[in-house]
């Protein structure tokens, strides 16, 4: 049995694909009020996978459900992750596996510190999904999941190889460099989509030389943590592949949700400061993005 915590776009995407594959799961929503909202709709989700629309009836419960949890996929926003997992502490079995799908860095270590008896895995996700309404989900970009242990030496769970082909997954024993590279790409794209209120593909033209300056500084931050990357190539490849997409950070802004800015760009700026690096372009980017959120 897999439990999914969080009924946002990513949590629903996991639930939809597990449902289609016939894998036993439960989607944990925030509270009884949210559960009643789903129940009133027959727990139905209209899932557009890019090829067809499917109407699925999801298996949903609340944190108060007493059933034990052995495998938990945490699909909340980074700032909400620790408190959300904490609400399930009485249900977590000794040695439970926690799979953390959060953007950026910082929230994963906070959970690992609070749940020392759990196996902690980090997942770098490149799927794109968004909700035109509460009970609709569009799988906008088919991506990949790279999974690895936060604590070195933790073995992969047995069921990882049993996931359906729709959940493309690989195991990476050293996950931190993967998370750092994704963080750096997010830093180079998402804040600009806030500042200019634009889609990903418009960032190079709007940002101009500022983008290149930020990439160069991010490359230094990665190097200070022993992470190799051709960051400029990766950033422009992502921009090209997601040109028509609205970044998750921009979506949060438009929906008046809290963003994860402090967990990627804020984290990168703090890491640069700790390493004694001068990053004027990134510092300016953070201030401008924060201004855009006000």
Where are these regions (language model features)?
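NAD(P)+-binding Rossmann beta1-loop-alpha1 motif at the extreme N-terminus of oxidoreductases
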Residues: 1-52
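NAD(P)-dependent Rossmann-like dehydrogenase/reductase catalytic/cofactor-binding core
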Residues: 212, 216-294
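Helix N-cap/beta->alpha junction signal
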Residues: 31, 103-104, 265
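Helix-loop-beta segment of a Rossmann-like dinucleotide-binding subdomain
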Residues: 136-146, 194-203, 245-255
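Rossmann-fold dinucleotide-binding core
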Residues: 101-181
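Rossmann-like NAD(P)(H) cofactor-binding subdomain of soluble oxidoreductases
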Residues: 46, 51-136
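Active-site-proximal catalytic alpha-helix in oxidoreductases
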Residues: 176-219
């Amino acid at each position: 049995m897999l439990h999914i915590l969080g009924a946002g776009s990513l949590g629903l995407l996991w639930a939809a694909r597990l449902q289609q594959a016939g894998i036993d799961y439960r989607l944990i929503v925030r509270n009884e009020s949210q559960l009643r909202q789903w129940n009133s709709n027959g727990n139905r989700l209209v899932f557009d996978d890019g090829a067809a629309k499917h109407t699925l009836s999801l298996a949903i419960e609340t944190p108060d459900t007493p059933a034990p949890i052995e495998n938990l996929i945490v699909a909340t926003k980074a700032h909400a992750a620790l408190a959300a997992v904490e609400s399930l502490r009485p249900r977590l079995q000794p040695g439970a596996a926690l799979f953390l799908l959060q953007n950026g860095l910082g929230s994963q270590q906070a959970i690992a510190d609070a749940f020392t008896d759990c196996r902690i895995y980090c997942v770098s996700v490149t799927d794109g999904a968004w909700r035109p309404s509460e009970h609709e989900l569009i799988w906008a970009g088919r991506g990949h999941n790279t999974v690895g242990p936060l604590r070195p030496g933790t073995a992969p769970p047995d069921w990882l190889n049993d996931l359906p082909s729709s959940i493309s997954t690989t195991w990476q024993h050293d996950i931190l460099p993967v998370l750092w590279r994704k963080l750096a790409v997010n830093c180079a794209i998402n804040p600009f989509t806030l500042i200019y209120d634009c889609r990903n593909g418009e960032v190079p033209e709007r940002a101009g030389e500022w983008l290149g300056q930020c990439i160069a500084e991010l490359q230094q931050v990665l190097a200070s943590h022993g992470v190799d990357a051709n960051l400029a190539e990766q950033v422009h490849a992502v921009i090209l592949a997601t040109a028509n997409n609205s970044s998750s950070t921009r979506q949060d802004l438009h929906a008046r949700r809290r963003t994860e800015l402090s967990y990627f760009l804020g984290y990168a700026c703090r890491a640069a400061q700790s390493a004694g690096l001068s990053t004027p372009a990134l510092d300016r980017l953070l201030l401008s993005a924060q201004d855009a959120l006000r």
